[in-house]
């Protein structure tokens, strides 16, 4: 075993050593071939996040044994892409594999890894990793990465202390740390603290970047300070047109939409389109969402057509954006058409698309069509179906079809989808039906189904007792049931118990 590991390590090192000799001989067809290989490798690595996809270490080792070029800068890129598409654990496994191969990390590499640790293992693990780094490795990138972690988790006290430490160490030389703090305060619902950070930036002779200006504008919008918005725009104009980005105009449009200034919103959206990079999908998504916000269906379709011309192979993210937009516009014919188009072209069946279609049909009281989408989805993918089932159940309960809703609930339990958690709204809706029908037996049967999943909560027992009270029936053993579950009886439950459990 030790010999095979040594051979693997030597082969990996040899692969790295040939980095500069990649494009030669039969690779003269080169760039397209190389790009195709990269796509193939990334596709394999990203599939590891799916059920039965395999393990990262085994896959990377196999690449090395097969002579597939596995270079550090490519691995870093794959890790960044996995992070972008919300697979931080898989991305972290790439770094862990590189560490086992004794590949040296720069400060920037450590910064990325720290971020991935926070995303996949939590903030405490990220702090431990940061503290384990040698002082010679800790630089502006690593300090900045930890600050970002604090800000994302809205740990204001830690973020402020860490930021002051960065200032003392001369690790604050650009707008990024300030932008992180601004984003944190916006997330904390404290937009009034953003302007002071802009002042602090300027006192340090740091020029605001386009992101800074965008968040400053956002903060003014949150405070409904339209004069403040105009002042920021005037300052940006003084800086020069180059400081304006599509994101600036997206924020402007969102602010104007929120206060009902649709004319100004339209102007901002036109500026967004003129300033955006046509190769960035998110720009089209923002346009679609914002035009939806002003109920401009014709512009939504126009941007959708632009996106499809730019990207003939439309991905799931774009289809999801369009379907959600059409659903908000109550364009059921559009939803039907786009959903059918997606189903006919998709590589992987994404239940989010089906959920939007189901929700759209139910809004129009078209239960049969919604159920047809659900049944079709069950044949085409392995789930998860919890969201779809809840949508159907809520609709059935609102339309006095509790028997059908219960069948869906029982089916969900039989599916044994361990990731499913029902909403409190759904449980309350079921019990509202039992209470109005004075159906104690039905409520108890429902509780039995619930306990197949997990013990009943205190809130569920309250709803059950209300059903007994509505039915005018006693439940002599209710106190004992609560005690056995270790539930601390609150004032409302004491009152209910006094009436149903004398």
From Swiss-Prot:
InterPro entries: Pentatricopeptide_rpt, TPR-like_helical_dom_sf. It is found in: Mitochondrion. It comes from the Eukaryota. PPR repeats lie at residues 139-173, 174-208, 209-243, 245-275, 280-310, 315-345, 350-381. Pfam families: PPR (PF01535). Residues 1-13 form a transit peptide. SUPFAM superfamilies: TPR-like. Belongs to the PPR family. P subfamily. This is Pentatricopeptide repeat-containing protein At4g01990, mitochondrial.
């Amino acid at each position: 075993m030790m010999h095979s590991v040594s051979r693997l390590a030597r082969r990996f090192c040899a692969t790295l050593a040939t980095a500069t000799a990649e494009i030669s001989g039969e690779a003269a067809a080169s760039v397209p071939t190389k790009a195709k290989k990269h796509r193939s490798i990334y596709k394999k690595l990203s599939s590891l996040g799916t059920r039965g996809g395999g393990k990262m270490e085994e896959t990377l080792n196999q690449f090395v044994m097969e002579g597939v070029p596995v270079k550090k800068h490519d691995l870093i890129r794959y890790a960044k892409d996995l992070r972008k598409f919300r697979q931080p654990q898989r991305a972290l496994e790439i770094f862990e594999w590189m560490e086992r191969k004794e590949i040296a990390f720069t400060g920037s590499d450590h910064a990325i890894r720290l971020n991935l640790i926070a995303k996949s293992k939590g903030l405490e693990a990220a702090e431990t990793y940061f503290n384990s780094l040698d002082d010679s490795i800790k630089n502006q990138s690593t300090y900045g990465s930890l600050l970002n972690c604090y800000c994302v988790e809205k740990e204001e006290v830690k973020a402020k202390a860490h930021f002051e430490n960065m200032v003392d160490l001369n690790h604050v030389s650009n707008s990024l740390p300030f932008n992180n703090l601004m984003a944190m305060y916006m997330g904390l619902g404290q937009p009034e603290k953003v302007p002071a950070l802009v002042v602090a930036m300027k006192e340090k002779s740091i020029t605001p970047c386009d992101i800074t200006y965008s968040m400053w504008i956002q903060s003014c919008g949150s405070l409904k300070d339209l004069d403040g918005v105009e002042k920021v725009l005037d300052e940006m104009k003084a800086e020069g047109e180059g400081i304006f980005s599509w994101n600036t105009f997206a924020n402007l449009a969102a602010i104007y939409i929120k206060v009902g200034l649709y004319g100004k919103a339209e102007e901002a959206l036109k500026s967004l389109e003129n300033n955006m990079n046509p190769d960035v999908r998110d720009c089209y998504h923002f346009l679609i969402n914002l035009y939806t916000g002003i109920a401009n269906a014709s512009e939504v379709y126009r941007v959708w057509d632009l996106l499809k011309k730019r990207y003939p192979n439309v991905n799931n993210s774009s289809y999801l954006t369009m379907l959600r937009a059409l659903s908000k516009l109550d364009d059921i014919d559009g939803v039907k058409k786009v959903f059918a188009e997606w189903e006919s072209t998709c590589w992987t069946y994404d239940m989010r698309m089906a959920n939007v279609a189901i929700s759209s049909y139910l809004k129009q009281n078209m239960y049969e069509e919604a159920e047809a989408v659900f049944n079709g989805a069950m044949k085409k993918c392995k789930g998860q179906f919890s969201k779809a089932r809840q949508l159907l159940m809520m609709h059935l309960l609102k339309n006095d079809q509790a028997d059908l809703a219960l069948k869906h609930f029982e089916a969900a339990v039989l599916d044994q989808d361990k990731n499913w958690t029902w909403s409190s709204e759904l449980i309350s809706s079921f019990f509202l039906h039992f209470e109005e029908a004075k159906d104690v037996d039905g409520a108890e049967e429902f509780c039995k189904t619930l306990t197949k999943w997990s013990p009943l909560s205190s809130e569920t027992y309250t709803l059950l007792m209300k059903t007994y009270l509505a039915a005018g029936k006693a439940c002599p053993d209710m106190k004992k049931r609560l005690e056995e579950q270790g539930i601390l009886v609150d004032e409302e439950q004491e009152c209910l118990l006094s009436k149903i459990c004398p």
